[in-house]
Design a protein with these regions (language model features):
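Conserved short loop/turn motifs at secondary-structure junctions
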Residues: 62-70, 148-155, 182-188
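Beta-sheet entry/capping signal
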Residues: 7, 99, 117-118, 150, ...
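Surface-exposed loop/turn segments and immediately adjacent short secondary-structure elements
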Residues: 1-113
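A short alpha-helix capping/helix-loop junction motif
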Residues: 96-97, 141-149
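Conserved pre-motif C helix in the palm subdomain of viral-like polymerases
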Residues: 113-144, 162
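Conserved catalytic palm subdomain of right-hand nucleotidyl-transferase polymerases, strongest
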Residues: 55-62, 94, 111-120, 161-193
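Residues immediately flanking
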Residues: 59, 104-106, 123-124, 136, ...
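Phosphate/oxyanion-binding active-site loops and adjacent basic polyanion-contact surfaces
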Residues: 156-160
Length: 193
């Protein structure tokens, strides 16, 4: 079992694409400064309130509903953690410890490929990730190309399918030949590369 997931999650050391010659969009200085501002109680509590508290607890034993329910009691310590992270850019190593659990993708799963690994992460780590994601949401649409249709708020993966459909229809109407390439990305989000 370890070998199967080791192969899945290990970099084979093969060729990697180069980013030379790519022209990236940039954010301005004011937006960059806002990304680096100190965390406020409002930022943290808003992110915490938006999170689903019904998820399984992580290695720390606390679910998000604990942090939501106990906010008034724990906010000083939580904000101390955020202040420390902001000032030093790091946290204790154990904070992002996970429990890896295998969940069957279908009934009667026997082969390891029939299982999906789920990471149970601690609540503070999830909260930090959410606060950082909320900040990035404000600028990500400016730096991610408009042709990227997923993972950016307001854009839909269905737009890519619609554009592909229109391109094929246009080629057929003009009686042009072409090549259609469909990529199987079944494991795209399970890989570290």
């Amino acid at each position: 079992m370890v070998g199967a997931f080791k192969n899945l999650l290990t970099d084979p050391g093969e060729w990697h694409p180069s980013m030379d010659g790519l022209d990236f969009n940039r954010i301005d200085g004011e937006e960059a400064a806002r990304l680096e501002e100190a965390f406020t109680k409002e930022d943290v509590f808003s992110a915490l309130s938006d999170m689903n508290g019904d998820k399984a607890p992580g290695p720390d034993g606390f679910s998000l509903s604990f942090w939501q329910f106990s906010w008034e009691f724990v906010k000083v310590e939580v904000m101390g953690f955020f202040k420390e992270f902001h000032e030093h850019g790091r946290f204790v190593k154990s904070l992002n410890s996970i429990f890896l659990v295998l969940i069957p993708k279908k009934g009667g799963a026997e082969d390891l490929r029939d299982f999906k690994p789920i990471s149970l992460v601690g609540g503070l780590y999830k909260l930090l990730a959410k606060v950082l994601a909320n900040r990035l949401k404000k600028v990500v649409g400016k730096v991610v190309f408009s042709t990227q249709n997923t993972f950016v708020e307001g854009r839909q993966i269905l737009n890519a399918a619609l554009i592909a459909n229109e391109a094929i229809d246009s080629m057929l109407k003009r009686n042009e030949s072409g090549v259609l390439c469909k990529l199987d990305i079944e494991k795209a989000y399970d890989h570290l590369n």
